[in-house]
Amino acid sequence: MRQKTIDAIMAHAAAEYPRECCGVVAQKSRVERYFPCRNLSAEPTEHFHLSPEDYAAAEDWGTVVAIVHSHPDATTQPSELDKAQCDATLLPWHIVSWPEGDLRTIQPRGELPLLERPFVLGHFDCWGLVMSYFRQTHGIELHDYRVDYPWWENSYPDNFYQDCWYECGFREFDGPPQEGDLVIMQVQADKWNHAGILLEGNMLLHHLYGHLSQRVPYGGYWQERTMKIVRYKDVRGNEACRK
């Protein structure tokens, strides 16, 4: 970034302090410009939600090339949510600390390995792991049902696993479970709220809330909480699927 752009970002961080500032860097031909954006977060001292209208205004001017936000009274160390959102935007993120005035840039990491992912609801969660498994193993893009709120709590109407497994391409099947089947579970909730993938050797690949993604033996606790096992209909060798 050019010094003029950095100066504009620091001035915005100072003006918004102790709230998090947010904005974008845009490029038009050889001209680089910082666009301050409104932070619409309900907790602006802890998080940022960049105004879609302000983002669109920057896009109208040129090409958005980076996302910017500040960490008030903290270092530039990115949180797991920062990293996950950077991955999702496919753009560099510039993080500034204020009042220290430090600057750090993080880059999108691409597709993460299936094991030992950090948990970030709405990004790296149980359905996110299932999506990545099918993308990495079969080249299949499943529908993205991820949301960043605890939809399994009774105060929310959503019931994604129970309502959406069929429309997403999964089917009941005849015969025993096999590698690649989707295991839908109900864990400390009144709804089906967790899922994993069966692996060879009766292992379960899953990503539990607040934990790293992992492989565990499928039995006992997880088997007792299993509500349904289904199979993706369009994978070669899955002819046992029902219509």
Swiss-Prot record:
Gene Ontology biological-process entries? proteolysis; symbiont-mediated cytolysis of host cell; viral tail assembly
| GO terms for cellular component | host cell cytoplasm
The active site lies at C126, H194, H206
Instruction: State the span of motif (JAMM motif).
Output: 69-82
Q: Which InterPro entries match?
A: JAB_dom_prok, JAMM/MPN+_dom, MPN, NLP_P60_dom, Papain-like_cys_pep_sf, VirAsm_ModProt
Does the record bear Ubl conjugation in its keywords?
A: no
The protein's GO terms of the molecular function aspect are: cysteine-type peptidase activity; metalloexopeptidase activity; zinc ion binding
Q: Where in the cell is it found?
A: Host cytoplasm
* Family, similarity comment: Belongs to the peptidase C40 family.
The function of this protein is: Plays a role in tail tip complex assembly. The tail tip complex is assembled successively with three tail tip proteins J, one tail tip protein I, one tail tip protein L and one tail tip protein K. The tail tip complex interacts with tail measure protein to initiate tail tube assembly. The formation of the tail tip complex is completed by the addition of tail tip protein M, which is followed by tail tube polymerization. May be excluded form tail tip during maturation and would be absent from virions. May be involved in tail measure protein processing.
**Official protein name in the record:** Tail tip assembly protein K
